[in-house]
């Protein structure tokens, strides 16, 4: 049943992604029956030859993973469990994107923002340049992903080394804005910690969503406000 639900979520979210939704607040609970897969676009990662949706659980959704313990997922299947989707309603600079998320071993649920969606050779929605704001057991990372010479390229743009516990929901907040001097910055908050960095490549408007990867991850809600 869970696999059928995951397939439904993936298929139901494939929509014409060139049409941009209106800027508006988003407030989604991922409890059963509380959200609509048609409000989302399932997106392929440029590094992977597959595209996964999410699996509905009792009080959250999870990335697609084999039915094995969390440490086994991380150690043996970390490259096979990437699930990603973005909300059709775009966010804009000054809004806060947030999600309550967790992991059952070490990593790595995240919030993703992307100015636009590219297409895979098969015509499916795929990330080009995008930013990943990642929660894991040793802190927070911001990864800036790009396509360089036709190949995926990424680097760690910012990080904070602090401990986070497994099997514990954390609310991660991300805000892109301009400082008083007009430069763009990203501020990330989680668990009472805060970090920020300057990046003038950050988009003025963007798709925002979630990615589960490198282990079994849980997502309880998602907001753009």
Question: Which sequence ranges carry the predicted segments?
Answer:
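Positively charged n-region of N-terminal signal peptides that target proteins for export
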Residues: 1-4
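Bacterial N-terminal signal peptides
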Residues: 7-16
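Low-complexity, Ser/Thr/Pro/Gly-rich disordered linker/stalk regions
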Residues: 21-95, 135, 164, 179-180
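Secretory/extracellular carbohydrate-interaction modules
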Residues: 67-69, 73-145
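Surface-exposed coil/turn segments at beta-strand junctions on protein surfaces, enriched
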Residues: 90-92, 104, 163-167, 203
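Carbohydrate-binding surfaces in secreted/extracellular proteins
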Residues: 99, 166-197
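Short, aromatic/His-centered strand-loop micro-motif at the edge of beta-sheets
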Residues: 149-171
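Flexible glycan-contacting loops in extracellular carbohydrate-active proteins
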Residues: 196-221
